[in-house]
Design a protein with these regions (language model features):
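SAM-dependent transferase fold signal centered on methyltransferase-like domains
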Residues: 1-340
Length: 340
């Protein structure tokens, strides 16, 4: 099936940044196109006029989720939307039951009720038309910017709808920052590489202790570095050693498994600090946040990823759902030859 392009979900306000990233990423793969990116819409549509776009977009820092664009439908008739969508799609598409999605924007969130109510009629119509088959391999997505306008996309099953994770705030967690790290572990870190009991982490700028708390939940001991106080439940944990020190000056004597950093500072300074630890073999892996500048945020991300690669680290960055004006980076130092 010819793919017209991609549908990309993002944080509202970052459409222009994501569009630039998508166009550049497509060009490196020999695919040329353009983006429709309306400010504050929380989604971007990349279109390849030649119809030669890959089925799915590559990993993009500023995309929460990406779908292969099948078609766009406008002026859907009220009362017969489901039938109109089913009629526009080929039989035997081989997709699981569809997900109804709306943009995560001020304009899009009021459509949540419509999407919930429309789900059953859409599933019935698509199944009756022979479009969906219940296969678990890929899923149909219907994205509604408004109730009469629909983008139809296809993506592998199992992803979060619209890239929004369904994570619950743990009752005993000291801060909501725990959700940011939890999402990063799910989205950026392959399961075999995630923290496990017996490993040790350093958490720079730890207070009040959200990231430290989550690492302890996973059985990892933690050195928490912050001049400020930790929450009582974190400070009293025997698996936590609190160092009242400056995050930029603290160093360990040996190597640690994990380096964590959610310090509010200039992104260049945070990136430099992470590079120092990884270059000196003080940490095997790092998860850190970069607070984004107002202008050209993609530049600092790409520069950081380039610099990490130069010191032998494999890295990926993402603007998570629980991130705000920031991106989260996961970097892991490649094993040395002597370790094999």
């Amino acid at each position: 099936m010819e793919r017209r392009g991609w549908i990309l979900h993002c944080r509202a306000g970052y459409e222009k940044t994501l569009a630039a990233e998508a166009i550049a990423a497509a060009a490196t793969r020999g695919v040329y196109g353009y983006c429709r990116a309306r400010p504050q819409s929380a989604y971007v549509v990349f279109e390849a006029p030649a119809g030669d776009a890959p089925p799915l977009p590559p990993p993009l820092t500023f995309a929460r989720a990406g779908l292969g664009l099948i078609t766009e439908l406008t002026d859907l008739p009220e009362g017969r939307r489901a039938e109109a969508i089913a009629a526009a799609l080929p039989r035997g598409l081989g997709a699981a039951e569809p997900w109804m999605e709306h943009p995560d924007s001020d304009e899009g969130r009021p459509l949540a009720r419509f999407c919930r109510r429309f789900a059953s009629p859409a599933r019935r119509a698509l199944k009756a038309a022979g479009v969906t088959s219940g296969t678990p391999d890929q899923r149909l997505h219907l994205l509604f910017p408004n109730s009469r306008h629909c983008f139809v996309g296809l993506a592998p099953s199992g992803r979060w709808p619209a890239g929004i994770p369904r994570l619950r705030m743990p009752r005993n967690a000291p801060s909501r920052s725990v959700l940011k790290l939890e999402e990063a572990l799910h989205r950026l870190v392959p399961e075999p590489e995630r923290p496990y009991p017996g490993e040790h982490a350093v958490d720079l700028g730890a207070a009040p202790g959200g990231w430290t708390w989550l690492m302890r939940e996973r059985g990892t001991t933690v050195t928490a570095v912050d001049n400020g106080p930790l929450a009582t439940e974190v400070a009293d944990d025997p698996g936590v050693e609190h160092h009242r020190a400056d995050a930029f000056r603290f160093r360990t004597r040996g190597e640690v498994d994990w380096l964590l950093c959610d310090v509010v500072d200039r992104p260049q300074g945070i990136a430099r600090l992470m590079l120092q630890w990884l270059r000196a073999d003080r940490a095997r892996a790092a998860i850190f946040n970069l607070k984004l500048p107002m202008r050209r945020p993609l530049d600092i991300v790409q520069r950081t990823l380039h610099d990490l690669a130069a010191v032998g680290a494999q890295a990926q960055a993402a603007q998570l759902y629980h991130d705000r004006e920031e991106v989260t980076v996961y970097a892991r130092r490649a094993p040395s030859r002597s370790s094999h």
